[in-house]
Amino acid sequence: LPREWRDQPVGRDRGMAIEESQSLLIEMIVCRSRPFVRYLMPLLQKHFGVSGPEWDPENVYAHLTRVRRSLIRVDADELTYPLHIQLRYDLEKQLLAGALAVRELPEAWAEFMQARFNVRPARQQEGCLQDIHWAVGSFGYFPSYALGAAIAAQLFEKLRGDVPALDEQIARGEFAGLFGWLREKVHGLGAKVSTQELLKLATGKPLTATASLRYLEGKYLEDPASRSAAA
């Protein structure tokens, strides 16, 4: 964030959707990519002495992008994660509208998981007590994760277009191009403009789901890792 705006309202981040987008862009898009795995593997071999076919870069990538049902939101993959957010969003709306009593929440949660994931939590720690958000009063926060993922995909798509050598840079452990673009297009604006205006300035268009769908289809359908490696 701009130093000259520090301690001013305009010097804050734009909001939680943008903040989550920055986390997810690095955590999910960059760090679970083939270029990053190429950068990571020599470090693992040097510092931890890993070897063998299970440490083949494509096999590691397959594990990082494995899709499977999970009871726990923070352990979920990119494809099933939105369903975890939908669950919380739907139940949260029902709670606030008075359509769902707090005592009914555990069973409503379990029914959703059974219907959408074909798994059922055995205890409440795997269900409605796994997150701290409601306990600390953070109602309305969960959609920030879904919005953040969509924003991250849209930003990254434009970033790759603006920095054609980005994949090669990441594979070499050179992140100046990545973070330089983000600082200029996102961080440097602080809270000066709205979220939609920030996206228009950075990508040329307001937020849509198009880039997110294109990213997921490309990664998991058009150019997937060898799933047998991650079995």
Region locations from a protein language model:
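C-terminal, non-catalytic "cap/extension" segments appended to globular domains
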Residues: I85, Y89-A231
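Active-site-adjacent bridging/hinge elements
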Residues: L1-R3, P57-R66, P121-C128
